[in-house]
Amino acid sequence: NLKRYIKKLGYDNVEVICHGITEPAKTPVDTPYLLPVEKATQNVFGPYMVYPNRPSTAPDYLWTNILGLPTIQVRWCDATSDNHAPNEHLTLSNYIKGTELTATVLKEISEM
């Protein structure tokens, strides 16, 4: 609980007001869609790491929990892109690779 955690840190003068939450969502790693995504990512970006769980406030639950569809997120940026920082950026090279990756994945999945 966030309120308990903040209090434990010694901040008694902080008020936490919850206006809403994002439901958790998870696609099983044995989904048949993972292999084409992994293959395309390897071909376009080279070596990469798969994170079976990733904290995110992306609305994946709409796809997984409501529509019953799998979701797989692939980052186009590199470790120096400072995600969600004021100076967040994406190189032109990674933008082009990301576009290629998306097109490749869509093609591979359409042929399944």
PLM ranges: what are they?
Residues 9-112:
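An extended, acidic, His-containing surface patch that forms the Zn2+-binding/catalytic region
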